[in-house]
UniProtKB/Swiss-Prot annotation:
<feature type="short sequence motif" description="'HIGH' region">
    <location>
        <begin position="127"/>
        <end position="137"/>
    </location>
</feature>
<dbReference type="GO" id="GO:0006420">
    <property type="term" value="P:arginyl-tRNA aminoacylation"/>
</dbReference>
<dbReference type="Pfam" id="PF03485">
    <property type="entry name" value="Arg_tRNA_synt_N"/>
</dbReference>
<dbReference type="InterPro" id="IPR008909">
    <property type="entry name" value="DALR_anticod-bd"/>
</dbReference>
<keyword id="KW-0067">ATP-binding</keyword>
<keyword id="KW-0030">Aminoacyl-tRNA synthetase</keyword>
<dbReference type="Pfam" id="PF00750">
    <property type="entry name" value="tRNA-synt_1d"/>
</dbReference>
<dbReference type="GO" id="GO:0005524">
    <property type="term" value="F:ATP binding"/>
</dbReference>
<dbReference type="InterPro" id="IPR009080">
    <property type="entry name" value="tRNAsynth_Ia_anticodon-bd"/>
</dbReference>
<dbReference type="Pfam" id="PF05746">
    <property type="entry name" value="DALR_1"/>
</dbReference>
<comment type="subunit">
    <text>Monomer.</text>
</comment>
<keyword id="KW-0436">Ligase</keyword>
<dbReference type="InterPro" id="IPR005148">
    <property type="entry name" value="Arg-tRNA-synth_N"/>
</dbReference>
<protein>
    <recommendedName>
        <fullName>Arginine--tRNA ligase</fullName>
        <ecNumber>6.1.1.19</ecNumber>
    </recommendedName>
</protein>
<dbReference type="GO" id="GO:0004814">
    <property type="term" value="F:arginine-tRNA ligase activity"/>
</dbReference>
<dbReference type="InterPro" id="IPR036695">
    <property type="entry name" value="Arg-tRNA-synth_N_sf"/>
</dbReference>
<dbReference type="GO" id="GO:0005737">
    <property type="term" value="C:cytoplasm"/>
</dbReference>
Length: 580
């Protein structure tokens, strides 16, 4: 195992030596000791706690007795036996040399955190073309991007991919409305957003005509459009080619704003015809069944229903394309694991897809994983592009930027350049959105509330960003003396020790979050670190501190917190404003 935590490793070595002195005939495993070290329930008990249970079992001695014997032999740290545990505390100088110094020189953030792992593809952000991108799409984008960043930070080999839906009924509806009913001229700009409005209007019209003779006509017209798209010919196909580019341009603008890039772009249109042909081949080989004119796989015996792959009219479905794409990912990109970041409403879909792949003999099916998450709602309920009750993303960003400029940055008018105001407003808005989308556990629903997410005094992105900006401002106002040796022993205030303990746990927090696909854990870590810094900032004077050595040590501690906040924000895909 990789032992990246220097304080934990030091404790491991000291414990191993102490165990050897207490029990000369017994040799303890370094890995077992390292893994048994935990954070005590209260920070004032110590930096780490070692449970003696496994050791006691091997020695056939009561755990409290082992704890007392080993603690008595500990050197290089303060060790206190507390029942079956040994609470271990290091002095400030050790913390400074082992943790703070490595944070300040940057080496702390370059340590590999995980053993060699399988080459993994993370597929996320699968927006549909011909629909408007809205705030509901952001949970997927933020979650997928954070997972990619966390895993890469930890040392994993990751391939990021996206799979936009540029085919299907939603596209046919939009094109149908444009050709047959739209009276508006196509705008010169923001064509992608305009397409989304066309899609919503199409749905409203179709719903109005349900139950009338026009309903069957509409259905036939939509089917004919889909056949044109699949056949790659006809006026609707030509219109699709043009309008598809408008949507892709909008996606790329959003990704540029979010600072998200993908190693691989897949499109449903690329999988459409080949996947349908493959399904027909599998049916001809007797590997699939027909039910009521549709081709698929009967999974009723496994309580997964009938996995439909070709409808009775010959058109494919999402599952059809996902089957073929899974093969492409493993065979063409040579990945060893495939993760799909898709909301929980698609749980049955992926269970069916993975099971069908397995039945078809695709061995890598066992290495496919659906990372599901709950969806985003507005305070008054769920969003729907079909109904048009959404908050368009670009409109939301502009509103949030205006709020930041009016509420927080207006005081700097005349002092800051317009360029700086715009830049920082954008960074804070982005931080609010990303943190708000990531701070909740993936199984919990998110209710989007712009005002709450933009608060500077709550659990929010702007609060963490503001803490970083405050530290940056402090460093500019009171720069540390270049080359001066820092006396870490000066950091003996309770709030200073709390910060040092927290800083040493950053890599451990990221490694655990990456392993469990839970960026919410990093949000919690950063929020707690920012809170601890603000306590320290108010309790321990810096600029007015008369003792030079103490001031230098506190400035170094502040800088270490700032670097950790900055790296933590980066792991979550969030910017760190230098001033706010």
């Amino acid at each position: 195992m990789i032992k990246h935590d220097s304080i934990r490793l030091l404790a491991t070595n000291l414990l191993k030596d102490a165990i050897g002195r207490a029990y000369p005939d017994f040799s303890a495993s370094e890995d077992d000791i390292y893994k048994a070290l935990v954070n005590p329930p209260k920070s004032d008990l110590g930096d780490l706690a070692f449970g003696c249970f496994i050791l006691a079992k091997a020695l056939k001695t009561a755990p409290p007795q082992v704890a007392t014997a080993v603690a008595a032999q500990m050197k290089g740290a303060t060790a206190v036996a507390a029942g079956p545990y040994i609470n271990i505390r290091f002095d400030e100088q050790t913390h400074g040399e082992q943790v703070l110094a490595t944070i300040l020189d940057g080496s702390y953030f370059k340590k590999p955190l995980m053993e060699k792992s399988p080459k993994t593809m993370i597929e996320y952000s699968q927006p549909n073309t011909h629909k408007e991108l809205h705030v509901g799409h952001m949970r997927n984008l933020c979650l997928g991007d954070a997972i990619v960043r966390m895993l890469r930070y930890s040392g994993r080999e990751i391939v990021s991919s996206t799979f936009p839906g540029d085919m299907g009924t939603h596209v046919a509806k939009c094109l149908w409305y444009m050709k047959k009913h739209n009276q508006e001229p196509v705008p010169e700009t923001e064509k992608g957003e305009w397409l989304g409005r066309m899609y919503s209007k199409a749905n409203l019209l179709l719903e109005d005509q349900n139950g009338t003779p026009q309903e069957d006509i509409n259905r036939q017209e939509l089917t004919a459009i889909l056949h044109q798209l699949e056949g790659k010919t006809g006026p609707y196909y030509d219109l699709w080619l043009e309008t598809r580019e408008w949507s892709i341009e909008l996606m790329k603008k959003v990704y540029a704003w979010a600072d998200v890039t993908f190693d691989e772009w897949y499109f449903e249109s690329e999988m459409d015809s080949p996947s349908a042909a493959w399904v027909k081949q599998l049916y001809a080989e007797g590997k699939l069944e027909m039910s009521q004119g549709a081709i698929g796989k009967d999974l009723e015996s496994e309580k997964l229903g009938f996995c439909m792959l070709l409808k009775s009219d010959g058109t494919g479905l999402y599952a059809t394309k996902d089957l073929l794409l899974a093969k492409h990912k493993f065979e063409d990109v040579k990945i060893e694991k495939s993760v799909y970041v898709v909301d929980m409403r698609q749980a049955l879909h992926f269970k069916q897809v993975f099971r069908v792949l397995e039945i078809l003999g695709f061995e890598q099916a066992k290495n496919c994983f659906h990372l599901q998450y709950n969806y985003v709602e507005l305070p008054d309920g769920a969003m729907s592009s079909r109904k048009g009750n959404i908050v368009p993303l670009r409109e939301l960003v502009h509103r949030m930027e205006d709020h930041v400029k009016t509420t927080y940055l207006s005081r700097y008018k005349g002092e800051w350049s317009e360029e700086d105001v715009e830049k920082i407003a954008g960074q804070v808005a982005k931080g609010a959105i990303f943190y708000g989308m990531l701070r909740m556990d993936t199984n919990k629903k998110i209710v989007f509330d712009m005002n709450e997410w933009l608060k500077l005094d709550g659990e929010s992105g702007p609060f963490v960003q503001y803490s970083y900006a405050r530290i940056s401002s402090l460093g500019r106002k009171f720069p540390r003396t270049a080359g001066a040796k820092i006396d870490w022993s000066r950091l003996n205030h309770a709030s200073e020790r709390q910060l040092m303990q927290s800083l040493g746990g950053f890599n451990t927090a990221v490694a655990a979050a990456a392993e469990n696909f839970k960026p919410s854990a990093i949000c919690t870590y950063l929020y707690d670190l920012a809170k601890s810094f603000n306590v320290f900032y108010h309790e321990c004077p810096i600029g007015t501190e008369a003792d030079v050595a103490t001031r230098e040590a506190r400035l170094a501690l502040s800088e270490a917190v700032g670097l950790t906040l900055k790296n933590g924000l980066a792991v979550l895909g969030m910017p760190a404003p230098e001033k706010m």
